[in-house]
């Protein structure tokens, strides 16, 4: 563009914040500026990226517009601050070195192999042909290989692999896709794979990937090292191999996730929505639960028994892609990965039940003894264990169930900030949350803290994030329950930092997590539909209607309490609650049948326990219903009974039987409903009617309270909100009355989001107090 007037030339300094370091952002700015004929500089500093651009006003406007629209795959912008500066007649655009005193403020999340790297991986003329650790600034390991900030190679597990001249040249070239790609490597200078037998001894073979695939297709179970840990892998179409994996893992019914080459290949056994497909092929590459086709159980026997969905994932590491490339004969067609492929692999976390994910090579051989027949290891150390993230496909959207690889440590942006908070989360499905300013950083999924190993993982995760983000907390939030490990950890942290300890009620935190995700701090109604959490009255809650304000919460209502003979045992043995309900209502025949079904001659004595604790938990109500309807008496994995009840009802139109629900002192009592539905010959219809009635009764209660409290915003959260049939029906009923409904979508509605809620409760309270 020719410039006729000096006055049309301007200069600006742009301060760009967000995920803009370690993701190819400076080369992106460089190319963008060059294409618009601008001059200036770009550099990283401790606060983000600083760009100085000089040129015609029109070009500057186009540059800013394109800056927001044409981002690199892993980059995201939170804010751009522009400042006019003097025109200096700059002659070129250059990338400057990071300021010596700057520390990168963000570690990007791990990312699935990008399309450019995939093309190179399977191009026999490329120097990285079939190299299992190919990556660039747009993909590859990040969080899981980083020990400390700044995010530079010496701070990662790649520090032991000096780059060869070719890789170093790429690393230094601002126009190269691998410019400052910290894990950059090739077969000459980088990590390599090893194939080992079940004892850890090397397997003699010409090609490790080819031999691994041969053994998997021959029915063997392999442990394969990935980004955040090992997977146990077998042929998903081999019923014998799947059954053997279940036997070895002591996992009789819990569903397995499977990996397939693409949507076309997956369409034989699942139906994938457009939004689910987008997530499957995103840099995060989560597992997505998708509805089964009619052929699914025939094609993949034993993968997801008694369920209507299968968790699927696409290849996301070079090793995954190489297995599928090998399976279809190493084709020369560059679009080979778009073709149908018969290979389907079980990909399940490599760990003994409930233990942390295995990440070390020697650890894998030791801890997976008796489970894996062979091991594919490599010598790039995993520093931070990180499970696969899990989402579920719903009618209109997708919802996170487990937030881990690909999402950690990406921040949740809060409406406002405050003093730093560390929240240590709940007992089950634990995560912790650390805040800095208006950013909330959640740890990866930790799991249940009933095991010492998981407790150690939680403590290390908190320490790691606090070091990375230089967080010194003023407040430590935790659950009300005094006996949780997360509470003990919070007490230790409060002493360590001389910080104030703030206990937060479990369901209050559930609702606050949804508020944090959606940027809410005004009063809301919260419907917490959950398993069990300790209430302020020292009783187990779980079916609560709360009024949540910045100052705190008020319990407005709950479902009527039901008895739990055996207390916490009822979470696994739903028959206990079923027996109690049958016994208290004189259903002798039903009680005797139940005793035979569960092979418990002493069932009458258990049902007669006079001192059984009471709970308002909707989760326990689901457990009771599943047993009373004959769907599931004993859960072999957490949540099995409610999940199977939901699956049983799918495809049936539920009838509203609210006439069978008594309201006692404002609390809906569902016992009469359960008794009536338990007499149905068709248990699938019983399940459908149960959920429809639940939705109708709960919605009616919320609508009534909304009118009284003059609050139009409703947050749904808790473990039961993973039941998409229930929540989507609730949403429809509430929105028909023009209520605004919010759910956890990017942060799990189950206990995986509780730590975020704990932290937001503290920050809301502080903000409210400061305004007074």
Could you describe each region identified by the protein language model?
Residues 84, 229-294:
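A phosphate-binding glycine/aspartate-rich beta-alpha loop in the early core of alpha/beta enzymes
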Residues 507-529, 534-535, 574-583, 688-692, ...:
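Glycine-rich phosphate-binding/hydrolytic loop that grips phosphoryl groups
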Residues 479, 497-510, 712-717, 724, ...:
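Conserved phosphate-binding/catalytic loops in two-lobed NTP-binding clefts
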